[in-house]
C-alpha cells in the first residue's frame, strides 16, 4: 500500500483590499480579502494559491497590497504582478516588459 501526498495549488485567484464590483456582494467587507481566501483554501484542502493581481476599479495599487499580504503567508501564497491590465491607464501601451522587470525587482514575484 502506498500513501500519496499531493500538494494542491490553486493557480488563479484574486484578492483585493476593496471589493471592486458594483453592486457589492453582501459580505463585501471580507469578500476578496486574503484572510477570506485562506479560510476558503483551508476549508477545501488547498495548500497554496497564486494571487493574480488585478488593478481593477478601487484597487489601483493591487500589486502593493498583495505583496504586503504574502509576506505574512509566504508558504501559502505566490504573487503574479499586473503590468498591463485593461483597467489601468497603461493598458496596451509600450513598456510592459520594463514594467514587469521593475515589478520583479520590487516584489517577490513568481510570474
Describe each region flagged by the PLM.
Residues 1-64:
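An N-terminally biased module of ancient metal coordination in phosphate/nucleic-acid-related enzymes
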Residues 48, 57-111:
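Active-site gating/metal-coordination segments in enzymes
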Amino acid at each position: 500500500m502506498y500513501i500519496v501526498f499531493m500538494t494542491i495549488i490553486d493557480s488563479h485567484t484574486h484578492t483585493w483590499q476593496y471589493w471592486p464590483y458594483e453592486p457589492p456582494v453582501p459580505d463585501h467587507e471580507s469578500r476578496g480579502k486574503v484572510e477570506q481566501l485562506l479560510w476558503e483554501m483551508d476549508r477545501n484542502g488547498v495548500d497554496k494559491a497564486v494571487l493574480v493581481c488585478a488593478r481593477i476599479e478601487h484597487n489601483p495599487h493591487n500589486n502593493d497590497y498583495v505583496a504586503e499580504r504574502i509576506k505574512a503567508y509566504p508558504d501559502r501564497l505566490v504573487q503574479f504582478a499586473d503590468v498591463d491590465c485593461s483597467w489601468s491607464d497603461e493598458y496596451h501601451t509600450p513598456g510592459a516588459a520594463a514594467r514587469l522587470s521593475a515589478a520583479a525587482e520590487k516584489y517577490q514575484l513568481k510570474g
